[in-house]
């Protein structure tokens, strides 16, 4: 049992951290304040291959494994959660399923430009009445000759209105229940695709969250991902990886909050000493560090299992659950350690909390 990252993953982490510190972090506060989408940051990431880290080189990616991708999302999230979410959704929810289930023509036509960062991808799963109950999908795709005619609505679609392609879950066989759901590749500029106003959120302001509408949208039947009726099984597998990604985001944000709280506690003086020297503060920092390490290794283990083709559904869910809740607790304590300043935008901890 070896808990150390090997030299290859250490090198990946160093490169990802350098990019996050040099390119992403300087823009993070402005992105959060204005809500603008950071195309400059995303394009810079694409130039370094960071939009296709776990995708083989033959399809425009880096050819690294899932753990390397986890390290990327962790480092990006510590600098800017919006940037991390954008890339996590693009790669994990669009590139990866195309790699797993797409045929060769689909990989060449869609996966390669996505992995190269020539366009962004989105995954249209959630609907107004089908959130956690994804099997309740009402969007339909009716075959008409050599085309599918798609009608329906998707909500909470990350990257939706800025994507070049959307993988859409739709009912292709109404009589088959969950086995009648299929995944279909839909170009975002296809006739019949439209977008509502992007949703305003409490945090992650630089991440685009869209409502997507399909009205008699026609796409070739060749855009079916895998076989008819495999959509539910496919997105269950994909969401396992997505949960690891959310866990990695949580770890990255929590790490940034802990670092900020530690640094502030070492600088701030009250009653003639650093506040870090007060036992109440040191206990808080100790709890934060312990929860962070526990979360990190749950996430890494889930990624490790996935890379080896071992069952990881439960482990991915555990990692997401614990890491996300640990991040909330850590960020909350970071604000408390900052006192009144923690509530202001002068310090980054309020952004980490959101």
Language-model features and meaning:
Residues 1-89, 101-106, 113, 117, ...:
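Alpha-helical interface subdomain recognition
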Residues 64-65, 133-135, 159-164, 177-180, ...:
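Short glycine/proline-enriched turns and hinge-like loops at secondary-structure junctions
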Residues 81, 131, 155-161, 204, ...:
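Glycine-rich phosphate/pyrophosphate-binding beta-alpha loops
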Residues 100-102, 142, 168-172, 185-187, ...:
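Short beta-strand-to-turn element immediately C-terminal to the catalytic PLP-Schiff-base lysine
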Residues 117-125:
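A short, Trp-centered hydrophobic/proline-enriched beta-strand micro-motif
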Residues 129-140:
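Active-site-adjacent elements of ketosynthase-type condensing enzymes
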Residues 136-138, 189-220:
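Flexible, small-/acidic-enriched active-site or ligand-binding loops
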Residues 147, 151-195:
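A short core secondary-structure module
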């Amino acid at each position: 049992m070896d808990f150390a990252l090997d030299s290859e993953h250490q090198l990946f982490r160093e490169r990802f951290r350098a990019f996050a510190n040099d390119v992403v972090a300087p823009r993070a506060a402005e992105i959060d304040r204005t809500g603008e989408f950071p195309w400059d940051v995303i394009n810079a990431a694409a130039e370094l291959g960071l939009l296709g880290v776990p995708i083989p080189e033959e399809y425009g990616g880096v050819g690294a494994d899932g753990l390397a991708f986890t390290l990327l999302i962790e480092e990006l999230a510590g600098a800017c959660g919006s940037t991390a979410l954008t890339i996590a959704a693009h790669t994990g929810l669009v590139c990866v399923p195309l790699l797993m289930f797409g045929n060769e023509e689909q990989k060449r036509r869609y996966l390669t430009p996505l992995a190269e960062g020539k366009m962004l991808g989105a995954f249209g799963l959630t609907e107004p009445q089908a959130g956690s109950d994804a099997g309740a999908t009402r969007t339909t795709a009716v075959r008409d000759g050599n085309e599918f005619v798609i009608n329906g609505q998707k909500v909470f679609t990350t990257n939706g209105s800025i994507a070049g392609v959307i993988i859409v879950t739709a009912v292709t066989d109404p009589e088959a229940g969950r086995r009648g759901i299929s995944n279909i590749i839909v170009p975002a500029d296809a006739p019949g695709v439209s977008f509502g106003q992007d949703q305003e959120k409490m945090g992650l302001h630089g991440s685009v969250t869209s409502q997507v509408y399909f009205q008699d949208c026609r796409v070739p039947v060749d855009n079916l991902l895998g076989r008819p009726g495999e959509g539910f099984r496919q997105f269950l597998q994909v969401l396992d990886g997505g949960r690891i990604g959310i866990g990695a985001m949580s770890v990255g944000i929590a790490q940034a909050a802990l670092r900020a709280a530690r640094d502030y506690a070492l600088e701030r003086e009250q009653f003639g000493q650093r506040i870090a020297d007060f036992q109440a503060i040191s206990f808080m920092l100790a709890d934060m560090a312990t929860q962070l390490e526990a979360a990190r290794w749950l996430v890494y283990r889930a990624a490790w299992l996935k890379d080896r083709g071992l069952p990881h559904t439960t482990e991915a869910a555990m990692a997401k659950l614990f890491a996300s809740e640990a991040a909330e607790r850590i960020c909350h304590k970071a604000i408390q350690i900052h006192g009144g300043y923690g509530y202001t935008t002068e310090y980054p901890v309020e952004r980490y909390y959101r």
